[in-house]
Design a protein with these regions (language model features):
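Extracytoplasmic/periplasmic substrate-recognition and gating elements
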Residues: 65, 69, 77, 170, ...
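Long, aromatic- and glycine/proline-rich binding clefts that accommodate carbohydrate-like moieties
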Residues: 141-142, 294, 301, 351-404, ...
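Conserved N-terminal structural module of periplasmic/extracytoplasmic solute-binding proteins
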Residues: 6-7, 18-113, 128-131, 266, ...
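Hinge/lid segment of periplasmic solute-binding proteins
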Residues: 106-159, 168, 184-189, 202, ...
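Periplasmic solute-binding protein
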Residues: 114-119, 138-176, 207-234, 316-324, ...
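A ligand-binding cleft/hinge motif common to bilobed small-molecule-binding domains
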Residues: 111-115, 283-296
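Glycine-centered hinge/linker elements that transmit conformational signals in sensory
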Residues: 187-192, 227, 233-264, 303
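Paired acidic/hydrophobic, glycine-rich loop segments that form the ligand-binding mouth/hinge
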Residues: 102-105, 277-281
Length: 435
């Protein structure tokens, strides 16, 4: 009987403790918060005194002004460190302690993992009309099992940039976005470039670096070839990661390297210094070129596609998004804040301060840089062909293994089957807990 009473008291104590946690306001500053307002707490992944941090701060200030007397949004800046920790460590600690804020920022590819680990919950009250304001890629990125969990603070894209002077000298005609070069055609284009450049130079400036870059830049080669990384439910890699389409993609990269279409080792600024004709890079490259290489004659071409491309979406997308944590008890208010922070006005502010691409259609119309030839192309590519990265709770492992696979097989000539099957084993080791 004593044990039973003790157990009941323990449970009661835990419940009281949890209730206390729910009511506790302990994030950020509460300056400007009135008792009659509904308090909304938020963590973001950067520091305040950066262009991105300033954009978030300004959007929060505008939200609080618009909803004065109803809501108060309180932002706390928790920067990531070079290894990606810091912010992630804070999130993990918050999960363990039950002390997450109402809103957190989530890198787009990790949304599925956050859902599977019950870190975030579905948004509340986002209508079809609300959704129609966002790019399809934003809604697809944030939707898991037909429920919308996140809305993007921004979007992103990668372009196949080219040196107009070299391309013109080689007699190459750039295809339209809807009729890109196939792999075979792109190889022939690279041969033409190789015939007119010095032997120490290369047609393409590309590498397979560790980190997120490799899957971000080169997943389109898998998708446009009819392949994929995981099943639709994100829980199966066997038959996908090791499919015939994957082997074909790897061998295409090997063909490019073996015929010296790109360098086995990274050469800094190869493209920028006029020593290659093509480079896969993010939407930040044009501005970098303009500032550091003002005489560079820059163009942009569509991503090459598999020889049997079926016109499906395939180009890179994805960036940071806002989500409501599973700890939040005021989901409706938090969702209103998420809609504001990811909306048109906030998107314009973020793009003006950082150069990032907005997540809503109308924001582009308010930004003059997207009338520029290159930025307009990136926008249209994103709208027409943008494809989110693999949606799986084991996304970090999928990303890591894709990079390792390309490095080991293409650059280091390791056995294809052994390398790919090892990758399957590593990803499956993570997926077991979710099946």
């Amino acid at each position: 009987m004593r044990k039973k009473i003790a157990s009941i008291l323990l449970i009661f104590t835990l419940i009281i403790g949890l209730v206390g946690c729910e009511k506790k306001i302990d994030t950020g500053s509460i300056s400007g918060f009135d008792d009659n307002e509904e308090y909304i707490s938020m963590w973001v992944h950067t520091i305040e005194n950066t262009p991105e941090g300033e954009a978030y701060k300004k959007s929060v200030e505008l939200f609080n002004k618009k909803y004065d007397g109803k809501y108060f949004l309180d932002i706390e800046f928790i920067p990531r460190n070079e290894s990606g920790g810091g912010y992630s460590d804070k999130i993990n600690a918050g999960v363990m302690s039950g002390d997450l804020p109402d809103i957190i920022t989530v890198d787009g590819p990790n949304i599925s993992a956050y859902v599977s680990n019950n870190i975030i919950q579905p948004l509340d009250g986002v209508s079809d009309e609300d959704k129609s304001a966002y790019l399809d890629s934003i809604i697809e990125q944030g939707t898991i099992d037909n429920k919308l969990y996140a809305l993007g603070a921004m979007e992103s894209s990668v372009g196949l940039f080219y040196n107009k002077d070299i391309v013109e000298k080689a007699g190459i005609e750039i295809p339209s976005m809807d009729n890109p070069w196939t792999w075979d055609e792109f190889y022939e284009v690279c041969e033409k470039v190789k015939n007119i450049i010095p032997e120490k130079d290369y047609p393409i400036d590309m590498t397979f670096p560790s980190g997120e870059t490799t899957i971000y830049y080169y997943a389109p080669f898998i998708w446009s070839n009819g392949g994929d990384f995981v099943s639709k439910d994100g829980l199966t890699v066997d038959g996908y990661f090791n499919s015939v389409k994957t082997y074909e993609t790897v061998n295409y990269f090997k063909k490019l390297l073996d015929n010296k279409m790109f360098s086995k080792t990274k050469i800094d600024n190869l493209f920028e210094l006029g020593r290659s004709a093509f480079k896969f890079d993010g939407a930040w490259l044009p501005n970098n070129i303009k500032n550091s290489y003002p005489d560079f004659n820059l163009g942009i071409a569509p991503y090459p596609v598999g020889n049997n491309w079926n016109k499906e979406r395939y180009t890179p997308t994805g960036s940071w998004a806002y989500a409501v944590s599973s700890n939040s008890t005021n989901v409706s208010a938090a969702t209103e804040a998420v809609k504001w922070l990811s909306g048109i006005e906030s998107g314009v502010i973020l793009s003006e301060l950082t150069g990032n691409m907005p997540s809503t259609y109308d924001a582009y119309d308010k930004l003059p840089q997207f009338k520029d030839e290159i930025y307009s192309f990136l926008k249209e590519q994103l709208i027409k062909y943008g494809h989110p990265r693999p949606k799986t709770p084991a996304y970090p492992q999928v990303s890591e293994q894709y990079q390792r696979m390309l490095e080991d097989i293409v650059l280091n000539n390791k056995d294809e089957k052994e390398t790919i099957e090892y990758s399957i084993e590593r990803i499956n080791a993570k997926l077991k807990r979710y099946r």
